[in-house]
Amino acid sequence: MTRILDNDLIGDEGSVERTLRPQYLREYIGQDRVKDQLMIFIEAAKRREESLDHVLLFGPPGLGKTTMAFVIANELGVHLKQTSGPAIEKAGDLVAILNDLEPGDVLFIDEIHRMPMTVEEILYSAMEDFYIDIMIGAGDTSRSVHLELPPFTLIGATTRAGMLSNPLRARFGITGHMEYYQTADLTEIVERTADIFDMTIKHEAAYELARRSRGTPRIANRLLKRVRDYAQIMGDGMITTQITDKALTMLDVDQEGLDYVDQKILRTMIEVYQGGPVGLGTLSVNIAEERDTVEDMYEPYLIQKGFIMRTRTGRVVTEKAYQHLGYPYEKKH
C-alpha cells in the first residue's frame, strides 16, 4: 500500500507539482537562506555576463530541489535540460546531452549520486574547463576526439550528498542545503495551493495541515487533496480545522505528523529493544523495511522531531517518544 506520508512522487503528482511550481525566487516560499544566497550569485553572474557556477542542491525528498532548479534557469533567462543519474547509463548518453547544450544553458541532473563512475568522470573536465575528450572506435583504430563545450551551469540534486565522490563534489561552486520547512512557510504553501485549485480553506485549518505535514511541501499538497475530498463528502466543502483533524486522523496521521510506520518503528524500539540502542540493520529486519528506506524516508523526520537519537552504539528512543506514545519512561543509567 502506498504511504500517504511518502516523500517521493506518487501517481500523477509530477504534473500537479509542475502546475504549482513558482517561476522566480520572489515567488518561492521558504528556504530563505538558499534563496538569499542564490539571488546574489545569480545577479552577479548576469552582470558579468557569465554562466552561473555549478550548483549542488541536497536534502530530503519533496523539499523543492527540482523546483529550485527551474527557478534558477528562469532567473538566468536560459533553457533548462533535465535528466537523472539513473537515466545516464553510459558515457555516450552524457556526451549527447552535453553536446546539445547552448551557451548559458542549465543542465539539471536529479539523483546525481546514482550516476555510474565512468559517466561521472566525463563531467570533471566538462564542469571545470568546458570540454570533453572521448574515445571513438575500438582497438588499433580508436582515437581521441576533443570536444569544446559552451559555458553552462550544472545543477545537481541529491538526497544523499555523502554518496558523491570528492572530485565531483569539489567542482560545485555553490551548494544549497534544502531543509525541512517551518510551519508558517508550509501554511503559506497550503493556502497558495488551495487558491490555485479553487479550494476554500480556513487559515487555522491550513496551519493544522501544515503542522502535520512533516515539513515537506509535497506531503502537505498531497494531504490537502485528501482533506478536500473529506470536506466535500463529510461536510459542505469548506476545509475547517475540525474537518482537517478528522480527515488526517482517518489517514492515520497523528498530531506530530507520524503515521503507522513511524509509530511501528518507535514501538518496536521500545517494546523489543527497551528503547535501544539498536542497529539500523537489525531494526530494518524487525519492521520488514529496507535499510535504505528506513534511513532515508523515516529516520530523518523522527530525528528532527526529537523522537530518535543516533549514538555510536545505535539508535535510541527519546523520552519524548515514550510520552507521545503513552509508554512509561524510566531513565537509563
UniProtKB/Swiss-Prot annotation:
Annotated compartments: Cytoplasm
Key word Chaperone present: no
One of the record's GO cellular component terms: cytoplasm
Ranges where the record places region Small ATPAse domain (RuvB-S): 182-252
Signal peptide (UniProt feature, chain positions): none
Family annotation (SUPFAM superfamilies): P-loop containing nucleoside triphosphate hydrolases (SSF52540), Winged helix' DNA-binding domain (SSF46785)
Main location: cytoplasm
Any one GO molecular-function label of the UniProt entry: ATP binding
Keyword line: ATP-binding, Cytoplasm, DNA damage, DNA recombination, DNA repair, DNA-binding, Hydrolase, Nucleotide-binding
Pfam families: AAA_lid_4 (PF17864), RuvB_C (PF05491), RuvB_N (PF05496)
Keyword DNA repair carried by entry: yes
Catalytic reactions of this protein: ATP + H2O = ADP + phosphate + H(+)
InterPro entries found in the cross-reference section: AAA+_ATPase (IPR003593), AAA_lid_4 (IPR041445), DNA_helicase_Holl-junc_RuvB (IPR004605), P-loop_NTPase (IPR027417), RuvB-like_N (IPR008824), RuvB_C (IPR008823), WH-like_DNA-bd_sf (IPR036388), WH_DNA-bd_sf (IPR036390)
Function: The RuvA-RuvB-RuvC complex processes Holliday junction (HJ) DNA during genetic recombination and DNA repair, while the RuvA-RuvB complex plays an important role in the rescue of blocked DNA replication forks via replication fork reversal (RFR). RuvA specifically binds to HJ cruciform DNA, conferring on it an open structure. The RuvB hexamer acts as an ATP-dependent pump, pulling dsDNA into and through the RuvAB complex. RuvB forms 2 homohexamers on either side of HJ DNA bound by 1 or 2 RuvA tetramers; 4 subunits per hexamer contact DNA at a time.
Subunit structure: Homohexamer. Forms an RuvA(8)-RuvB(12)-Holliday junction (HJ) complex. HJ DNA is sandwiched between 2 RuvA tetramers; dsDNA enters through RuvA and exits via RuvB. An RuvB hexamer assembles on each DNA strand where it exits the tetramer. Each RuvB hexamer is contacted by two RuvA subunits (via domain III) on 2 adjacent RuvB subunits; this complex drives branch migration. In the full resolvosome a probable DNA-RuvA(4)-RuvB(12)-RuvC(2) complex forms which resolves the HJ.
Domain notes: Has 3 domains, the large (RuvB-L) and small ATPase (RuvB-S) domains and the C-terminal head (RuvB-H) domain. The head domain binds DNA, while the ATPase domains jointly bind ATP, ADP or are empty depending on the state of the subunit in the translocation cycle. During a single DNA translocation step the structure of each domain remains the same, but their relative positions change.
The protein's name: Holliday junction branch migration complex subunit RuvB
Organism: Streptococcus equi subsp. zooepidemicus (strain MGCS10565)
Source taxonomy: Bacteria, Bacillati, Bacillota, Bacilli, Lactobacillales
